[in-house]
Amino acid sequence: MAILYYDEKKLFQLNTENTTYVIGLSPEGYVGHVYYGPLLHGEPDLYPLRMDEPPFTPSVNKREKSSFLDRFPMEYPTGGVGDYRESCLNIRNAQGRMGCEIFFDSYEIFKGKRPLTGLPASFGTEDEVETLEITCKDPVLDLVVVLSYSVFTKENVITRSVRVKNEGSEALKVEKIYSACLDMDNEDFEMLSLHGSWGRERHIQQGALRYGKQLVSSGKGESSHQEHPFVALVTPGTDQERGEVYAMHFVYSGNFIGQVERCQFDTVRMVMGINQEEFCWNLKAGDEFQAPEVVMVYSAEGLGKMTRSYHAFYRRHMIRSPYNHKKRPILINNWEATYFDFDTDKLLDIAREAKKDGIEMLVMDDGWFGKRNKDDSSLGEWVVNE
């Protein structure tokens, strides 16, 4: 089984072929992050969720040290409860008060993966993927938060998503909802992201992780040439074959944020989701909201292993084309050959030569309409230029 639950220790263990992800439950019911890294053989332990309280701790529970939420490694941190690092979920009630505190309620482990309502998402058969859903509740807001983890064993991928449901009688405002969080001790991590512009996309930007917050985001309604919804943490000296990589990629083409925060206790929090800028969702009584999916990969063999994991995963579990696993038809486009200067005879010559090489379709590009002989006229005049 890819997903195991140890009832006595209150631990969930998610295994791929080469990696392990461990989630633990504190005595108070907080859902905490225990481990993500190379495959573990045998049962993990809960001790990473215990820590000493530093001075000036706003603790409300003298019995357990995990009550200090500003240092607790949360699986899904919420705003307004004493964790002053970046939150993943901010809820405002009908009276205008902001705050949400969720506690473990139940879990379900099942083979396969359910679709995400209204969203693009990965898929797989019951033999290819196994899913853990952890249900948490805020008893004050009557809010249900379901944390979903799908384990694609062969590809060494774990996908995450979140959905919330208002089970109360009053509407709630969702002011922020991210899809994933990863809390870890700092290992001199460097942050890697991708930037660019038109014609020069996906340039690697990598640098030391400073105290405070570093991010990549888009607030213009799309991911783009300039910003890509991908963030990775890498250990120093990481190259294509060596080094540890913790990566997140967002399956969403709208506003997004990928952020890494190094806090005062030298822990690191990486989050990803819908950009909270220009976002607010009115969650009426009985309504649900489904957040998009994040694809997580861990590699102990550098960026090359990470890249191959993503490539294999997207080919097998994201692309729904009937040509996914067979050769695709080939087409040719006349633009680079002719620019605006073409007529019927030129196009037929291109088509005849292309057919000799097995090309099955000719696409006629810019210049066929209006008096479109240069790029400063006739755009939008949908009349054939003969």
Question: Language-model features: where?
Answer:
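Short acidic, Pro/Gly- and aromatic-enriched capping/linker segments at domain boundaries
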Residues: M1-F12, T267-K284
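Terminal connector regions
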Residues: F152, E293-P329
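Polysaccharide-binding surfaces and accessory modules of carbohydrate-active proteins
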Residues: K10-Q13, E17, V31-E261, E277
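Conserved mixed alpha/beta catalytic, RNA-binding, or beta-rich assembly cores of soluble enzyme
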Residues: V260-C263, I274, E301
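Aromatic-lined carbohydrate-binding/catalytic grooves of carbohydrate-active enzymes
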Residues: Y323-E386
